[in-house]
Regions:
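C-terminal ends and interior cores of transmembrane alpha-helices
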Residues: 68-81, 286-299
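Hydrophobic core of transmembrane alpha-helices in multi-pass small-molecule transporters
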Residues: 3, 73, 83-101, 214, ...
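A membrane-interface helix-boundary motif in multi-pass transporters
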Residues: 143-163, 362-380
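Helix-to-loop junctions at the C-terminal end of transmembrane segments
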Residues: 44-58, 145, 263-276, 364
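Single conserved hydrophobic/aromatic residue that forms the stacking wall/gate
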Residues: 409-418
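Cytoplasmic helix-loop-helix junction between adjacent transmembrane helices
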Residues: 93-129
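Helix-loop boundary and gating motifs at the non-cytosolic
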Residues: 1-39, 207-212, 217-237
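Juxtamembrane intracellular "pre-TM" segments in multi-pass secondary transporters
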Residues: 177-210
Length: 418
C-alpha cells in the first residue's frame, strides 16, 4: 500500500514542471499554480476526509474512493493541453489525493493494531516503502520511452499515475476494516476541524514560529516545480545536449529523496546536541545551499554542485519539518496538540506552499535562470537571519529524551512538499 501510495505521486510531482514548461510552453506563474494546488488542498481536504472516515465511511474504503476519483481526474488532465482545463483537472485530482496520505497512515496503524504490533517499532520500516515507491516511479518515467520520447516529458506520466491510482483504489477495499464512530459525541465544526488551535497565535512565541513556518514553507515546492524544467533547459545548449544529467534529470533529482531518508537518522543526534532553534536554522541555511548550488551548477563542470544540491535537500526538508513538529509537540497542551500539529501543516504545506509556488513562478518569469535560484537563496538567507534574531528559545537537552521515536514516527508525514 505505501509503495503504491507514493509511487502515484512520484510519477508526476518532480517531472510535471518540465512537461508544462517544455511540452506545453506554460509560463513560470502558470507552472507555479499547479504546485499551489497542493497548498489549496492541504488547507481543508485532509480534515474533511478525516471527519468522514471517523464518522461515516471506513478509512480503507474512503481511501479507495479518493484514489479512484483522483485517478479519473488525472486521466481527464492528461488529455488537456490548454491551461484552464488542465489546471482544473489537476486541482480536482490533488484535492482527492492529498487526504489519502493521512488516510493511508490511519489504515496502516489500524492494521498494525489488529495484529497487536507496536506502531512506533513496525511502522517506520513499512513507511520507508513509500519512499522506495516514490523513487521507483521517478526512475520509471525517466527511463521509459513511448514513441521514442521519455514519459517524463509527456502527458503519459499522468496516465501512469492514474493507473497506479486505480490499482491502489481496488486494493484498498481488501485491506483490514477500520472502525467508524457513528455515535461519537457531537462537536462543533470549530473543534472538529481543529480551528481552536489557532488561538495559539495569541502567544507571541508560537505566533512567530507559525509565521516563519509559513515563510519557510514557501520554499518547499520550488525545486519540485522548477528543478527538472531548469535542468532540461540545458539541453538546448549544444555542449550539454547529450549530457546524461539532462537526459536523466529525474534520476538525478531522486537523490533528494534518498538524502531525505538518510537525514532522518541524523535528527535525534542534532536535536539533542544543538536544540530545536539551531536545527531549524541549519535547515534554513541548507535551503540557501539547495538553491545556491542549483544556480551555480550545470551538467558539465558544475555537475558536482547539482549533486550537492540534492544531498543538502534532506537536511533542508527534514530538519525543519521534524524539529518544527517537535516544537509544537512540546509547547502545546494535550487537548489541542493534534490540532496544533494541523495548524503547523496548514501554515507550511497550505499557506506557505500556495503563496510560495505562485511567487516563485512570478520570479522565474521576471528574472529567468539562473538568477531566480540566487533570489530564492537570498530569500532563504533573509528568513534565516530574521528567525535567528526574532525567535527566542533556550535549549534544554533533558527535554530531548524520546526524540528518536518521534523522528521515526514523522517518516509517516506527507513529506513531498519536497
Amino acid at each position: 500500500m505505501n509503495f503504491l501510495q507514493y509511487a502515484i505521486w512520484g510519477s508526476w510531482l518532480i517531472s510535471l514542471g518540465a512537461y508544462l514548461g517544455g511540452g506545453l510552453d506554460f509560463s513560470g506563474l502558470q507552472i507555479g499554480s499547479f504546485f499551489a494546488t497542493m497548498g489549496i488542498a492541504s488547507l481543508f481536504m485532509p480534515a474533511v476526509m478525516g471527519i468522514i472516515a471517523d464518522r461515516w465511511i471506513p478509512a480503507q474504503k474512503l481511501l479507495g474512493i479518493c484514489h479512484f476519483i483522483s485517478g479519473a481526474f488525472l486521466i481527464a488532465a492528461a488529455s488537456q493541453t490548454a491551461y484552464a482545463p488542465l489546471y482544473s483537472c489537476m486541482l480536482l485530482s490533488v484535492m482527492f489525493y492529498m487526504p489519502t496520505i493521512a488516510l493511508s497512515n490511519s489504515v496502516a496503524y489500524n492494521a498494525l493494531d489488529l495484529a497487536r504490533l507496536d506502531t512506533v517499532k513496525h511502522f517506520p520500516p513499512i513507511r520507508v516503502w513509500g519512499t522506495v515507491g516514490f523513487i521507483a516511479a521517478m526512475w520509471f518515467v525517466d527511463l521509459t520511452h513511448i514513441g521514442g520520447v521519455q514519459i517524463k516529458l509527456t502527458e503519459w506520466q499522468l496516465y501512469v499515475s492514474a493507473l497506479l491510482s486505480f490499482v491502489l483504489a481496488d486494493y484498498s477495499f481488501s485491506l483490514p476494516g477500520c472502525p467508524v464512530e457513528r455515535s461519537a459525541q457531537k462537536q462543533s465544526w470549530v473543534d472538529t476541524l481543529g480551528l481552536r488551535a489557532f488561538a495559539l497565535f495569541k502567544e507571541k512565541r508560537m505566533a512567530i514560529f507559525f509565521v516563519f513556518s509559513m515563510l519557510l514553507g514557501a520554499a518547499l515546492q520550488i525545486t519540485n516545480a522548477f528543478g527538472d524544467s531548469y535542468i532540461q533547459n540545458f539541453g538546448s545548449m549544444p555542449q550539454y545536449a547529450d549530457s546524461a544529467i539532462v537526459k536523466h534529470s529525474v534520476i538525478l533529482l531522486s537523490l533528494s529523496q534518498m538524502s531525505e531518508t538518510l537525514c532522518i537518522l541524523l535528527i535525534p543526534f542534532f536535536l539533542r546536541r544543538f536544540g530545536i532553534k539551531k536545527v531549524m536554522l541549519i535547515s534554513m541555511l541548507a535551503w540557501v545551499l539547495r538553491f545556491g548550488f542549483f544556480g551555480i551548477g550545470d551538467p558539465g563542470s558544475g555537475a558536482a554542485f547539482l549533486v550537492l544540491s540534492m544531498i543538502v535537500y534532506g537536511v533542508a526538508f527534514d530538519f525543519f519539518n521534524i524539529s518544527g513538529s517537535l516544537f509544537v509537540e512540546k509547547e502545546t497542551s494535550r487537548e489541542i496538540r493534534s490540532s496544533a500539529q494541523g495548524v503547523f501543516m496548514i501554515m507550511t504545506n497550505g499557506f506557505g506552499a500556495f503563496f510560495g509556488s505562485y511567487a516563485a513562478g512570478a520570479v522565474v518569469d521576471a528574472y529567468g535562470w539562473p538568477d531566480s535560484w540566487f533570489i530564492f537563496a537570498g530569500y532563504a538567507l533573509v528568513v534565516a537571519v530574521v528567525f535567528a534574531v526574532v525567535f527566542k528559545y533556550r535549549h534544554n537537552p533533558a527535554e530531548m529524551e524520546g526524540v528518536k521515536h518521534l523522528s521515526l514516527i514523522h517518516i509517516s508525514e506527507p513529506t513531498r512538499l519536497q
